Amino acid sequence: MNSQTHGNTWIDKLGLPKPLAWGYLGIIIFMMGDGVEQGWLSPYLLENGMTIQQSALLFTVYGVTIAISSWFSGVLAEGYGPRKAMMMGLLLYIIGTIGFVGFGMAKLDYGVMLVTYAIRGFGYPLFAYSFLVWITYRTPKDRLGRAVGWFWFVFTGGLNVFGAYYSSWAIETIGYQNTLWSSIFWVLVGAFFALVLNKDRFVPAGDAGSKTKELLKGLTIVREEPKVFIGGLVRVINTTAQFAFPVFLPIYMAQHGFSTKEWLQIWGTIFTSNIAFNLIFGFVGDRLGWRSTIMWFGGVGCGITTLLFFYSPVWFGGGFWPVLISGVLWGGLLAGYVPLSALVPSLVKKDKGAAMAILNLGAGLPVFVGPAIVGALIGTIGDEGVIWVLSGLYFLSALLTRFITMPTTDTVPVETSVAH
């Protein structure tokens, strides 16, 4: 489809595809705009009269549209080109934000909020994950682990770090609703870098018939290559806790004496460590093996640190630093799943867009699954029971990853290191 980029500049040696550098910058700014409400929206809604179940449902519906959009992003990017898919995501994001803030939040109209927040949910997967497909086609295989590590670096840095730190300042300076309005400015700036300054060309595949066929491949590939499906399941588990935590942990932390600002600072610092380790585990995966990195650092590591993060306010008497450190450990090990974005598309010789569609669906589903787990279980087993469920899922993902094996004729770094 496209000739892959090969270069020897310092940018290439870092594993960052030089032709797409502006796109990476655009992603971090766009995702900062998208992440302005993640750490505070749930407690804000509770303070304004909604129940935690209503809040969980709002995030669940939002997650459903994110999951749908995530699946379509892979095949639309391959069939129509990443630029068109990303532009579609930008427009849907802006439309949804205008409706959610201007009509839903302004009047606290729950029905309007459900519909418009769902529309907003179509936005960022089409924008960000279409760019990820772009990366997989334009990067040499021996550098792909690092290239996707950089993607998750900018994705997470924008969504969870800059978004959290910016909102901790903005909500006190310009207020909650104006903070959400400002997200439109940031996504437009991000789109300028990713779509205007980024001059790299991606040639879409085929005619209308082949594009329809490409959409169907996003479903049929799981039958043709079941390991792609397993990879998608592992990707779901990867960030389920990340999207479950904001629904109930701010309230849990408040019970142990943490203010909203302190929680946002903890959340932002957690993902500061995460973005650093996104890069580290990109390199580690290319050398130690993608599968081993996912199993031990991602699955087992996150299973343990999820429990540590939850119990640290109890064990350490509500101390800020022990909670922060335990959260940082969880955030760092969360990056152990980064090699999935290299492993899954490498399971197939062709139809990488379809394989990425499954992986992108796996990245989108946690936005639905995480809040759904909280909404369904917290009333019966409490927040402690929910945390054990989330921890157990991580250990399950380690077991599942054992079955994601590459053909013996392939040379990608699944279990052995690759010389560079």
PLM features: residue spans?
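C-terminal ends and interior cores of transmembrane alpha-helices
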Residues: 91-107, 300-316
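Residue-level signature of mid-helix packing/kink "hotspots" within the transmembrane helices
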Residues: 63-71, 160-161, 271-275, 279, ...
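Helix-loop boundary and gating motifs at the non-cytosolic
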Residues: 15-63, 229-234, 239-256
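Juxtamembrane intracellular "pre-TM" segments in multi-pass secondary transporters
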Residues: 2-17, 199-232, 420
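Cytoplasmic membrane-interface "Motif A"-like loop-to-helix N-cap segments
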Residues: 79-90, 287-300
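Helix-to-loop junctions at the C-terminal end of transmembrane segments
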Residues: 70-81, 171, 278-290, 378
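Cytoplasmic helix-loop-helix junction between adjacent transmembrane helices
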Residues: 116-155
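A late C-terminal transmembrane helix in Major Facilitator Superfamily
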Residues: 350-381
